[in-house]
Amino acid sequence: MFVRLTLADVKEGEMNNLLNYVKNSVIPSYEGLSGLLGIAACSTEDGKFMAWSTWANEGAKEASIESFNQALAGAMDMLDSKPESMEGPMVAGQTYVLVPKDGEEPFLARFVIGSGTQEGKTYDDVADFMTNTVYPAYESTEGIFAAGACKTGENTGFSFNFWTDTTAVENARPVISEVVSSAVSELISEEPKEYSGVCNIVKNYVDFPVGKLSDLNS
């Protein structure tokens, strides 16, 4: 699996217009793209626009670049500056409940972007930490339904976790804080940046079954 994440600053008063543009224009324009597994967008708690798409592999994502560029061109008048995009293969992931195709229930999306690993560590070490420490810890929480980590470079990447609502995340804060603290002390160079927001715009094209998200690669 391969994920592309886009973050952007939006002109004042344009956020709802931008989200409606994604819902009514971008998502329909992506219909039928080979290898597209899902697409979603939201406004973050600090006022940024955040969108992400999930693909079967990098080749499928690359084949969609014309559609992506057309979507970006249509959004530029609503943006304050050129958006920041990052992408990479999913190197760790888990679903805790079935996420069905065409599921469109609102949820809380939380993305975490690291600044890089400590000397002598790589993002593969981060992936192992996510798989063996973070995901088992999340099993004790209520309201989480998916988590993953994507490698953008030898020492860089981003992770995400999806929750039923804001309350679920706040109740899980002790667990989240503990795993972040462990990551900072053992793996990453400094505390990562978190972006989160309630997502009402989502389109899944496949079921995401309970278990390892990376199994969808096989």
Name each model-derived stretch:
Residues 1-50, 54-158, 162-218:
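Short S/T/G/P-rich N-terminal loop/turn motif that feeds into the first structured element of a domain
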